[in-house]
């Protein structure tokens, strides 16, 4: 039976269990990986407990659903076989003709490629993996793969997670990032989170000493595991920058508005409220980053699927920071950035885009909800625009904003 799509899982939950809360359906879709029965089990647990916490760590569901199946086939075997299954699950797909980057795994297990291939054939006989053209190996069931990754690299540490991450980050970055993300979203117990954090930090410390270029890339992917250290690193980097002179009025905003690009790691950091301080300090030194910072604000700090749940806390923090830094219109660069951002934040409907599983993209249509939080941040925007309108140089920008607002 082919796995269900995310939309099919969502429909299953709505029609059979009457679960309509998008936060619950999103988490259940993530953990079920297209397995309808697993989705129903998770849905029933969520209904019974009435809390999101009940389905943050689904180790129990996985254990009850896959435990006997795997114990009877491989988990009661030797570590070589279990380790091989874990390696395939970590990578999701392996081509036997391109095994060079995985030699370190075989060394960890103390086996050669022939023994690995013998294990693959046994796993195929046990319906754990599929083999295509006698060459390409793929885990048969994504949820089984998730279970094996946790068992091999976190619970039993047959191969340490840090060994996999450290050796594969350059050559198989996507597999590394997706696997770590899966562990922290599907098995989000304090114990698993701490074990994963510890392993990631081992690689962090090693790269910080050994390879500065690779370390920057690693921090970009895994800053959430050490947010304070990341902010300190970025703050030191910003302090060391010389700054520049740039005429912000020369930016062709209309032409660049829809050409979204946010590649700078300083602009990408999202740990509030400290990140706002860094973002604005960086902009003060490099006003030529105007469009990239504008796009970072509209992509990461505008309304998303969680804004209503959080009563628009992020938007209140953002506008408050703008109010501090525009200096009643005396800071021209900051004032102009605020006006451009305000045009986005004053919309009544929002269409954010989010990265989904396995290189997919999720599109949302989110209407503004009238709450104390939404009224607060919007009132703050209008008050600040009124202050800026007292300055002749901003009137044309604000009048254009009002025309755009009236056309919604």
Locate each region found by the language model:
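An amphipathic alpha-helix signature
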Residues: 6-14, 71, 113, 145
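Extended charged low-complexity segments that act as oligomerization/scaffolding linkers
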Residues: 28, 35-38, 128, 147, ...
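Conserved small helical "lid"/interfacial subdomain of P-loop NTPases
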Residues: 1-25, 31, 42
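Winged-helix-like regulatory helical subdomains adjacent to P-loop NTPase cores
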Residues: 49-122, 137-138, 142, 150, ...
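Extended amphipathic alpha-helical scaffold segments
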Residues: 96-97, 111, 132, 149-408
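The conserved phosphate-sensing helix
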Residues: 21, 30-46, 78-82
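C-lobe helix-loop cap of protein kinase catalytic domains
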Residues: 28-33, 120, 124
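A short, conserved structural fragment
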Residues: 122-135
């Amino acid at each position: 039976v082919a796995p269900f799509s995310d939309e099919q899982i969502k429909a299953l939950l709505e029609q059979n269990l009457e679960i309509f809360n998008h936060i619950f359906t999103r988490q259940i879709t993530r953990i079920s990986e297209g397995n309808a029965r697993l989705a129903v089990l998770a849905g029933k647990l969520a209904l019974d407990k009435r809390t999101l916490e009940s389905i943050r760590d689904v180790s129990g569901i996985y254990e009850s659903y896959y435990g006997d199946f795997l114990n009877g086939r491989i988990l009661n075997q030797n570590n070589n076989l279990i380790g091989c299954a874990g390696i395939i699950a970590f990578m999701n797909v392996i081509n036997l003709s391109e095994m060079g980057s995985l030699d370190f795994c075989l060394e960890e297990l103390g086996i050669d490629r022939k023994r690995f291939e013998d294990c693959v054939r046994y796993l195929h006989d046990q319906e754990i993996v599929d083999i295509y053209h006698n060459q390409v190996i793929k885990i048969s069931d994504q949820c089984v793969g998730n279970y094996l990754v946790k068992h091999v690299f976190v619970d039993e540490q047959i191969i340490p997670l840090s060994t996999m991450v450290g050796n594969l980050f350059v050559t198989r970055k996507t597999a590394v990032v997706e696997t770590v993300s899966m562990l922290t979203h599907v098995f989000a117990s304090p114990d698993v989170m701490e074990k994963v954090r510890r392993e990631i930090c081992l690689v962090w410390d090693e790269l910080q000493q050994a390879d500065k270029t690779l370390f920057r890339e690693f921090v970009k992917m895994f800053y959430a595991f050490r947010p304070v250290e990341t902010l300190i690193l970025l703050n030191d980097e910003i302090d060391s920058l010389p700054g520049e002179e740039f005429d912000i009025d020369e930016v062709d905003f209309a032409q660049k508005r829809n050409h979204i690009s946010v590649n700078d790691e300083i602009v990408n950091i999202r740990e509030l409220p400290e990140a706002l301080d860094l973002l604005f300090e960086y902009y003060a030194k490099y006003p030529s980053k105007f469009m990239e910072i504008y796009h970072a604000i509209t992509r990461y700090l505008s309304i998303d699927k969680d804004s209503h749940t959080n009563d628009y806390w992020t938007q209140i923090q953002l506008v408050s920071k703008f109010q501090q830094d525009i200096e009643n219109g005396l800071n021209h660069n900051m004032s102009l950035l605020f006006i451009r951002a305000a045009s986005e934040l004053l919309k009544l409907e929002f269409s954010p885009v989010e990265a989904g599983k396995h290189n997919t993209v999720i599109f949302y249509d989110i209407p503004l909800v009238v709450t104390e939080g939404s009224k607060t941040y919007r009132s703050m925007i209008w008050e600040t625009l009124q202050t800026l309108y007292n300055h002749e140089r901003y009137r044309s920008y604000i009048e254009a904003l009002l025309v755009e607002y009236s056309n919604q």
